[in-house]
């Protein structure tokens, strides 16, 4: 429909995320299984900060303060949306590192990230059937926060 009006739809990869983060809706927060499933579906649709903020406000109004695991679930959904817009297909955490699979592998953009002080000595390109970039986690770093920082840095490189 957008193409008929001469507007190109936003090209976005779907991103999956597998991080070592406690991200769920506990029964003690939302007792009804039906309501929990409905909220899980709503969270899965989050793609932007404003959508996350609106849902957080609604959840607080309906069920009270968010448990950390619900907040983490929303942050993972937001990460997936941001990463998809940045052209990242998959984010996983293994053996003290985050692994990012890119939709379009562009070594020039990766090189620009290598030059940033916070990534010096921590980024590595892994060749294989699916090229990927890994980011070594620092001790006591939070994987979700590190993933969001990388996605933001990567998306800024993509827009230049």
Q: What is each PLM-predicted segment?
A:
Residues 1-160:
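Accessory helical-bundle/CTD segments and flexible terminal tails appended to RecA-like ATPase motors
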């Amino acid at each position: 429909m957008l193409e008929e009006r001469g507007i190109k739809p936003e090209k976005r990869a779907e991103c999956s995320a597998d991080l070592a983060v406690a991200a769920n809706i506990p029964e003690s927060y939302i007792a009804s299984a039906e309501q929990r499933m409905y909220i899980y579906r709503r969270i899965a649709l989050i793609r932007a900060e404003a959508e996350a903020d609106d849902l957080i406000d609604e959840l607080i109004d309906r069920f009270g303060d968010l448990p950390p695991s619900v907040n983490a679930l929303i942050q993972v959904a937001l990460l997936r949306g941001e990463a998809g817009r940045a052209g990242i297909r998959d984010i996983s955490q293994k053996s003290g590192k985050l692994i990012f699979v890119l939709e379009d592998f562009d070594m020039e953009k990766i090189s620009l990230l290598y030059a940033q002080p916070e990534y010096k000595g921590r980024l590595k390109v892994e060749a294989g059937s699916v090229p990927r970039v890994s980011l070594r986690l620092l001790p006591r770093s939070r994987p979700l926060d590190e993933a969001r920082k990388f996605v933001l840095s990567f998306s800024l490189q993509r827009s230049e």
